[in-house]
């Protein structure tokens, strides 16, 4: 149907404005369709900088909704799903201790489950699945921990356990696992006093003894000659500082040591 030829200028103005709006809407729609969906998390710049990511935190309940409780995390709100509510329930204003990580959509989420390791810590984790991208490790919480192939010293096998350190991937902003411990451990000099007690995670049976990760940060060695019984790879044990070597690694003893040993 054609427009009348005697349409006045004032009558044509709304039509031009309406057409401009249509062109604008069409342009935005086409731009959105043309752009491929991002494979990165929805909020890596913000959530990866959150001081509670990968840690325990006591957070305040802001509001209760059918999916769960929303907790205050700086300028963000983090969901604690209802399945993690304590038996006595939650109310607005309550404080609850939670662990913060990312869900499958890259959003921060909270849980009361206990992960086997926090950010910066080392633990032996079991490989649940191996895909074309990497391995997924059982971590003690609802979401498995991803270890890319680049962070595997050898290709992980499903069902096997490996020592894994937790770090934040600088691209995705997510908590990620690495089996390349030497990239993350021993990058600073220890400052222990001889005789000081430390926690040692046994990670390797060496010809001279057992190589250990000390307090999740340093390399140490427990020597066969000092041990009355063999140790088990993957076990944690209290050890004692004998000395700090020139290479920054620690010599350890399995028992408290006396003054005579410290002077040798």
Where are these regions (language model features)?
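Single-stranded RNA-binding regions, centering on S1/OB-family and related RNA-binding modules
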Residues: 2-264
């Amino acid at each position: 149907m054609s427009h009348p030829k005697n349409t006045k200028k004032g009558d044509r103005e709304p039509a031009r404005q309406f057409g401009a709006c249509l062109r604008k809407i069409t342009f935005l729609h086409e731009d959105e369709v043309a752009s491929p969906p991002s494979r990165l998390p929805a909020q890596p710049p913000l959530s990866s900088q959150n001081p509670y990511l990968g840690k325990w935190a006591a957070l305040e309940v802001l509001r209760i909704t059918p999916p769960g409780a929303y907790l205050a995390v700086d300028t963000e709100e983090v969901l604690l799903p209802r399945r993690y509510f304590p038996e006595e329930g939650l109310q607005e204003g309550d404080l609850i201790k939670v662990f913060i990580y990312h869900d499958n959509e890259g959003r921060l989420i909270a849980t009361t489950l206990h992960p086997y390791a926090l950010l910066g810590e080392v633990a032996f984790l079991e490989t649940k699945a191996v895909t074309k991208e990497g391995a997924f490790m059982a971590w003690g919480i609802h979401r498995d921990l991803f270890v890319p192939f680049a962070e595997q010293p050898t290709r992980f096998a499903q069902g096997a356990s490996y020592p894994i350190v937790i770090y934040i991937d600088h691209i995705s902003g997510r908590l990620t696992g690495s089996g390349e411990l030497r990239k993350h451990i021993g990058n600073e000099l220890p400052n222990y006093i001889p005789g000081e007690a430390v926690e040692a995670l046994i990670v390797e049976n060496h010809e001279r003894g057992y190589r250990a990760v000390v307090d999740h940060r340093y390399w140490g060695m427990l020597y066969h000659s000092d041990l009355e019984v063999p140790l088990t790879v993957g076990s944690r044990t209290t050890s004692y500082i004998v000395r700090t070597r020139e290479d920054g690694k620690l010599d350890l003893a399995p028992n408290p040591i006396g003054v005579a040993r410290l002077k040798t």
